[in-house]
Amino acid sequence: MGSNLNPKEDKFSLLLDPLSVEDIRRHGREAYPHECCGALLGHGELVTKVLALRNTTDEGPRRRFLISPADYQAAEAEASSRGEQLVGFYHSHPDHPARPSEHDLAHAWPVLAYVIISVRKGEPGELTSWRLKEDRSAFDQMELTIGESGQETS
């Protein structure tokens, strides 16, 4: 697992390219009313590629997402082949705010970024980014910047 986001910083930030944001929004729209999920590849706070992944949960995809071990390994391999790291993941919250749930808290890993998009009645809305505290007690909201980064999407 490998982000190089600095865990000792007081303020965390993440930079997403506008095309990445559009890909996340489109994925959320297409998956609705289910949760979508995907990987964020890049360096540090810079996301250089968004990789859509399958939601493989058996627990009810309207309220949960699960990334299979094979898809996780494929995302790590893609990042490695590009000389990059797995910076984090994104997922949608259908008809709920773009805030981490208790389930998100229980299943997150420190050092990774978690982007959440709210999708209400099929329309993507608020986009937020979060990082789990080292003691796993809660999330800290990250500053999310949308700007040019020369990113690819898929």
Regions found by a protein language model. Give the residues of each.
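Conserved, mostly hydrophobic/aromatic
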Residues: 89
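Conserved beta-strand-loop surface patch within small alpha/beta domains used
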Residues: 1-86, 94-154
